[in-house]
């Protein structure tokens, strides 16, 4: 639409918007300004268009930031689908995880982390991933990784301190599957350095592990003992029990496969 189709001149000589009726011009105070008597002003339509434009660019910037932080956060793209929207929110632990996110500012201020522990396959990593994805939406920087990856990444580096400091810089650090990494003196030294530096940074730490809490608390090996002591200093233990979700998924896939493989096969059956 042409500007002349939306603008008219009032009896006072000012231009008016035909849509909202507001003036698109205003008079300078008596005497004018540099020989000009009138200046431009935004009508309601102009203000609305400006606000919509600002919102568009702000939303675009937000989406790009979240996308960039998400790609940095996860080692595997499938983890991006681990969200509260896809979870069973009737689960008590999942509800606690959501509460952690909803109270993030207080958790961050008080340096409160979580230690999700329990049997294999009960969804500990998924729960941590849900926390990560929800905080990423809120423009919180998160890194979710494991010590095997950290040790592999740090091994060839001349400046290991820089890498460890980078891990400490994220607003939330999530270490997945504590206890499956190598038990060498070198590996345990790296693990302690990462945990210790993180705690000294004052930023929250979340850990998932299949190790029983009793075993963590009663560890006698000195190198592990000092690691676990530092973890329990910051992370509140949260038990994740129930049946193995991995076994349930595997069973469901097996039944689906049997159904598909037995389709139109006559008397041939999958056992």
Predicted stretch roles:
Residues 1-94, 248-271:
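A short, basic N-terminal segment
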Residues 90-112:
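A short, well-structured juxtamembrane/interface segment
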Residues 94-101, 117, 132-172, 182-189:
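Short glycine-rich substrate-engagement loop in P-loop NTPases that contacts/grips substrate
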Residues 108-128:
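Walker A/P-loop nucleotide-binding motif
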Residues 172-174, 206:
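Structural motif
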Residues 177-178:
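Walker B catalytic acidic pair
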């Amino acid at each position: 639409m042409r500007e002349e189709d939306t603008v008219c001149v009032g009896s006072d000589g000012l231009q008016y918007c035909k849509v909202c009726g507001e003036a698109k011009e205003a008079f300078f105070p008596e005497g004018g300004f540099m020989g000009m008597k009138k200046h431009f002003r935004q009508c309601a339509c102009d203000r609305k268009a400006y606000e919509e434009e600002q919102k568009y660019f702000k939303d675009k910037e937000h989406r790009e930031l979240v996308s960039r932080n998400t790609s940095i956060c996860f080692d595997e793209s499938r983890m991006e689908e681990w969200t509260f929207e896809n979870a069973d929110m009737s689960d008590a632990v999942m509800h606690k995880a959501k509460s952690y996110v909803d109270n993030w500012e207080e958790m961050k201020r008080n340096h409160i982390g979580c230690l999700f522990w329990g049997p294999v396959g009960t969804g500990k990593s998924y729960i941590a991933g849900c926390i990560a994805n929800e905080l990423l939406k809120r423009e919180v920087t998160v890194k979710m990784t494991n010590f095997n990856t950290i040790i592999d990444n740090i091994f060839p580096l001349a400046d290991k301190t820089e890498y460890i400091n980078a891990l400490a810089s994220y607003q939330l650090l999530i270490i997945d599957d504590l206890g499956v990494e190598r038990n060498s003196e070198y590996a345990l030294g790296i693990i302690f350095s990462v945990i210790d530096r993180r705690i000294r940074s004052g930023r929250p730490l979340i850990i998932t592990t299949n190790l029983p809490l009793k075993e963590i608390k009663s560890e006698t090996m000195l190198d592990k003992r000092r690691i676990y002591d530092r973890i329990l200093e910051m992370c509140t233990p949260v038990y994740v029990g129930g049946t193995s979700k991995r076994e349930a998924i595997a069973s469901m896939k097996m039944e689906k496969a049997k159904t598909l493989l037995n389709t139109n096969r006559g008397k041939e059956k999958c056992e």
